[in-house]
């Protein structure tokens, strides 16, 4: 009977994940508020059902009370976040909240399967991070001073990376973190956010060659410190954020092209300088033949293959024998017991989150906030690419964790902080939209008051259609609308591409 339930559950879980992923993209495209609300409600139901089924199956298999405790704690977190965001931040992006809750649910499920103690530790860090970051949207929304701290961001980021380089301990061939009173801190996770804020502040008003050089020098210092610490995966994340922000700010292709050329040369140099880089390239080329160097990549690939399209079912596989299954290779553990289809949906869900962040960036009228959203979105997408790409042998392994899914306190805190900043930008954009609409309505009322017969010249629906087709607005004098209004109208359909 238990085996039947386990085998049926994996198909139900896959179906729920497919439906949630499809609904996630549908919510991005949907413009009707009522229909979007129904989509979000359906997603919440799917999250609850998936958690219930997975934890119920694990309880049947093991009979541990700790499994029930983790289920109740996970449900308390998800429902608490949903309620608090709706009460405190009514303008927040609930699509982003739902995506975050689903990714965190997957994390809690697979970590409970692999190690209940690590799942509990992760939950404590998650709860504390969420509470600490709940004020971040208010700071982003009201904190006009943030754009004036440009050089403070630079000094803070360089200082944190330097401390790790000097005092950090080596793990996996790289200096990644420091330990204070038994607590490990990976300061590069915070530095990647301060770097984006620095570059946005530097290029928010002046994207001249001089400012580009300043931004390049500071970004290069960040990257070189990481290279000296042999943390090359994080260095690549920093570099990609730099390239994208520079291009968005200047719209000059030569800057990212020169950067990519420099990074390519640096990769060649790193290959000959660092032995662990050569080992990872050798594992990437032949994971079976280099089993004596490390078996983690081969074990991960075997695990995914043994799971097949729908997985073996929870507690029916052996993801526990995969080295660092809770961190770098958590995607392999997920695919082994939940299936490759589930893993593909997980990738698409991460892609949906990235598209949402980029869309928020596109709709920001102020360059400072636009560059922040673009930089943070790039870092998120790069981390997902490096983690999953390394575990499926698409690229050499980098040691980067999967955001919101892998075990790790610093990574969890920085990702929650990042998404809280994005929420603040989304709320700020909603405020700008409301203010813009008020100005439009006020101007329209003034025009009608000054010219009572004006509203009879053209019906409202015809006027709206004319504006959509022309992309211009007649202000009574035949002049085009100002830049902010034009950007607003042109980005209304930005998701329909």
Predicted regions and their residues:
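Hydrophobic transmembrane alpha-helical segments in integral membrane proteins
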Residues: 1-17
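Membrane-interface alpha-helices at helix entry/exit sites of multi-pass transporters
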Residues: 36-39, 211, 326-333, 370, ...
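TM-adjacent membrane-interface loops and short helices in multi-pass inner/ER membrane proteins
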Residues: 287-327, 331, 340-342
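Transmembrane alpha-helices of multi-pass inner-membrane enzymes
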Residues: 393-435
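Hydrophobic alpha-helical transmembrane segments of multi-pass inner membrane proteins, especially
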Residues: 63-293, 332, 336-390, 417, ...
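Alpha-helical transmembrane segments
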Residues: 19-25, 81-83
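Membrane-interface helix-loop junction between the first two transmembrane segments
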Residues: 22-39
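Short, highly charged, low-complexity non-transmembrane loops/tails of multi-pass membrane proteins
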Residues: 432-472
């Amino acid at each position: 009977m238990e085996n039947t339930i386990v085998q049926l559950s994996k198909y139900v879980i896959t179906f729920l994940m497919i439906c949630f992923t499809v609904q996630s993209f549908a919510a991005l495209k949907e413009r009707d508020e009522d229909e979007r609300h129904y989509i979000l409600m359906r997603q919440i139901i799917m999250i609850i059902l998936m958690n219930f089924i997975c934890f119920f199956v694990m309880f049947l298999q093991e009979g541990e009370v700790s499994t029930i405790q983790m289920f109740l704690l996970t449900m308390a977190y998800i429902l608490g976040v949903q309620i608090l965001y709706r009460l405190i931040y009514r303008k927040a992006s609930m699509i982003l909240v739902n995506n975050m809750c689903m990714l965190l649910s997957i994390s809690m499920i697979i970590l409970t399967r692999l190690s209940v103690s690590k799942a509990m530790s992760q939950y404590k860090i998650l709860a504390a991070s969420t509470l600490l970051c709940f004020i971040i949207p208010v700071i982003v929304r009201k904190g006009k001073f943030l754009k004036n701290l440009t050089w403070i961001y630079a000094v803070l980021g360089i200082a944190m990376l330097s401390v790790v380089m000097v005092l950090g301990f080596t793990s996996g061939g790289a200096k990644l973190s420091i330990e204070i009173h038994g607590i490990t801190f990976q300061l590069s996770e915070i530095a990647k956010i301060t770097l984006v804020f620095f570059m946005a502040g530097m290029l928010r008003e002046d994207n001249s060659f001089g400012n580009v050089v300043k931004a390049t020098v500071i970004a290069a210092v960040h990257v070189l410190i990481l290279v000296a610490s042999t943390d090359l995966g994080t260095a690549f994340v920093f570099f990609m954020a730099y390239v994208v922000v520079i291009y968005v700010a200047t719209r000059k292709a030569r800057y990212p092209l020169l950067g990519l050329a420099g990074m390519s040369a640096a990769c060649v140099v790193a290959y000959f300088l660092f032995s662990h880089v050569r080992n990872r390239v050798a594992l990437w080329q032949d994971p079976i033949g280099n089993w004596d160097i490390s078996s983690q990549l081969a074990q991960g690939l075997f695990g995914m293959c043994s799971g097949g399209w729908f997985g073996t079912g929870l507690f029916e596989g052996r993801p526990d024998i995969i080295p660092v299954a809770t961190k770098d290779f958590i995607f392999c553990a997920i695919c082994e017991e939940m299936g490759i289809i589930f893993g593909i949906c997980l990738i698409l869900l991460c892609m949906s989150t990235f598209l949402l962040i980029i869309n928020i960036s596109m709709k920001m009228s102020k360059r400072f906030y636009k560059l922040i959203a673009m930089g943070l979105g790039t870092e998120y997408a790069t981390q997902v690419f490096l983690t999953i790409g390394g575990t499926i042998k698409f690229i050499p392994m980098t040691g980067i964790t999967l955001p919101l899914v892998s075990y790790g306190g610093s990574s969890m805190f920085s990702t929650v902080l990042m998404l809280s900043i994005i929420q603040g930008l989304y709320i700020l954009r909603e405020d700008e939209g409301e203010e813009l609409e008020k100005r439009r309505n006020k101007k329209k009322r003034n025009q009608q008051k000054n010219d009572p017969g004006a509203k009879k010249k053209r019906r409202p629906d015809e006027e709206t259609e004319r504006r959509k087709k022309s992309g211009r607005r007649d202000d009574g004098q035949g002049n085009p609308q100002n830049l902010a209004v034009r950007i607003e109208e042109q980005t209304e359909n930005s998701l329909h591409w």
